[in-house]
């Protein structure tokens, strides 16, 4: 049983890494010039750093309307040093439907970044 379990975990890790890379590539392409996508080696979240004037609470509210969950940077600090950043879960498969929603969200981010 241990071999099957280890094999399952290895397959799952590979799948999640592939999804994270796909999401990062999508966001980099659609947010170039307005945000930096930070990718760490562990976990399945991406840290998005928008331009300093962007308040990611606005992005959070827009994302909620689209049923996309993000974590505004304000959740990760006691002051506003990360108010222009947000975290997004990249473990989901980038389906056509999810891609369409994320496209709308990235267009919104581009609009408020001007």
Predicted regions and their residues:
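Conserved glycine-rich beta-strand-loop-beta hairpin in the small C-terminal domain of fold type I
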Residues: 14-24, 36-49, 59
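Conserved C-terminal alpha-helix-loop-beta "cap" of PLP-dependent enzymes
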Residues: 48-86
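Amphipathic alpha-helix from the class-I
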Residues: 1-11
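Generic non-transmembrane alpha-helical segments
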Residues: 26-30, 58-68, 106-112
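Surface-exposed helix-capping loop/turn segments at secondary-structure junctions
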Residues: 7, 27-37, 113-114
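Preference for bulky hydrophobic residues occupying beta-strand positions
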Residues: 27, 48, 88-90
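PLP-dependent enzyme catalytic core of the Aspartate aminotransferase-like
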Residues: 65, 81-114
């Amino acid at each position: 049983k241990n071999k099957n379990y280890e094999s399952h975990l290895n397959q799952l890790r590979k799948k999640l890494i592939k999804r994270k890379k796909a999401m990062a590539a999508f966001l980099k392409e659609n947010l170039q010039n307005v945000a930096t996508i930070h990718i760490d080696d562990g976990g399945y979240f991406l840290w998005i750093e928008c331009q300093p004037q962007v308040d990611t609470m606005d992005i959070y509210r827009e994302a909620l309307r689209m049923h996309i969950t993000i974590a505004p940077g304000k959740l990760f600090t006691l002051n506003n040093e990360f108010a222009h950043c947000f975290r997004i879960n990249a473990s989901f498969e980038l389906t056509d439907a999810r891609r369409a929603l994320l496209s709308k969200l990235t267009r919104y981010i581009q609009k408020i970044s001007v």
